[in-house]
Amino acid sequence: MTIGKSPILLHHHVIFLLLLVLQVSGQHQPRTTAPPYIAQRPNQVPAVIIAMLMFTLLFSMLACCVCYKYTNTSPHGTSSDTEEGGHGEVAFTRRTSRGLGKDVINSFPSFLYSQVKGLKIGKGGVECAICLNEFEDEETLRLMPPCSHAFHASCIDVWLSSRSTCPVCRASLPPKPGSDQNSLYPFIRPHDNQDMDLENVTARRSVLESPDVRLLDRLSWSNNTGANTPPRSRSTGLSNWRITELLFPRSHSTGHSLVPRVENLDRFTLQLPEEVRRQLSHMKTLPQARSSREGYRSGSVGSERRGKGKEKEFGEGSFDRLKAEMV
C-alpha cells in the first residue's frame, strides 16, 4: 500500500511546489506600469497649448478683418480706399469727412430771393427742405443746378460740408475735374403739370422712393403764415406744429397713412426760365451770405445796406430786362 500511494503523494508535492514558486515569483516581481494620470498628463499639455494658440490666432485674424472692413467702408456702404485722380494718380479720400470743399460750394449760384421772385414759374412759395421755412425776400439762396432745388445758403453750406448730394433728390453734386459747368449741369426746362413727359414722371417716382422725401412729405404744407403761426424753435428752427407732425404723422380714419403727393416736391424746387438760370450760373455769388434774422454774417455796421445795394444792382440789370421781356 505504501508503494501504491507514493505516486499520488509525489504528484501532490509537485503541484504544491509549483504553486509555491508562482506565488513567490509573483510577490517579488516589480510593478512597471505607471498610473493612468501620470502616463497621460505629459501628452495632454502640448495638445491643450496648441489648441489655445490656434484659437487665439483665429480670433485675432477675424478681428483684424472686421476692423479693416469697418475702417475702409464709407457710411453709404461703398469702399472708400482710393479713387482715381485726374492724371491717373491715386488719391486717398478723407474718411472723416465726405463733403464738398469750400470752393466747390461757392461755385453754386447764390442770390437773393427777391431777385428771382418775380421770375419763378408756378404759384405759391418755395421752402427750404433743410429748415422747412419759406423763403423771404431778404434771404440769400443757393441753387443746385442739376436738380433746380434751392436752399438757404447757410443751411446748404452746412449740409454740403459733410455730404455731396442734394438733400431732396440725392443727386450727385461734386463736379468732375476739368469739366465745364454748362456741360456738367445741363439746364432742364421746367416741367408742365398738364403735359408731363415720361422722363419727368420716372425722375419724380425715383425721388419719392427716398426715405428722406417720404419723411418730409408727411408734413402738412397747408400752414398759413400769419399772426397765428407758432414760434420757431431756436435749436431746430422748426415750429411746434411741424415737430408734432414729424413725430406723429396724420392718418385717415381707416388707419392708413396719407399718401405723399408729387406736388409737395415743388415746394423745394425753384423753377426759373432757362435764360435766368444760365445767368445765375455765370453770375458772381454774393460776397457775404445773408441770414434771415441777423443780416450778413460779417456783423459789421452797414452790411445790411451793402446787401440791399447789391440786390439793387442785380435787380436793375439783366433780371429787370428779363421781367420786361416776359411781361
Swiss-Prot record:
The chain crosses the membrane at residues 47-67. It is an enzyme of class 2 (transferase). Its EC number is 2.3.2.27. A zinc finger (RING-type) spans 128-170. Its main location: membrane. PROSITE patterns: ZF_RING_2. CDD domains: RING-H2_EL5-like. GO terms for cellular component: membrane. Residues 280-327 are annotated as: Disordered. Residues 1-26 form the signal peptide. It is a single-pass membrane protein. It comes from the Eukaryota. Keywords: Membrane, Metal-binding, Signal, Transferase, Transmembrane, Transmembrane helix, Ubl conjugation pathway, Zinc, Zinc-finger. Residues 303-327 have a biased composition (Basic and acidic residues). It catalyses: S-ubiquitinyl-[E2 ubiquitin-conjugating enzyme]-L-cysteine + [acceptor protein]-L-lysine = [E2 ubiquitin-conjugating enzyme]-L-cysteine + N(6)-ubiquitinyl-[acceptor protein]-L-lysine. Pathway: Protein modification; protein ubiquitination. GO terms for biological process: protein ubiquitination. It is found in: Membrane. GO terms for molecular function: transferase activity; zinc ion binding. Belongs to the RING-type zinc finger family. ATL subfamily. The RING-type zinc finger domain mediates binding to an E2 ubiquitin-conjugating enzyme. This is RING-H2 finger protein ATL34. It comes from Arabidopsis thaliana. The gene is ATL34.
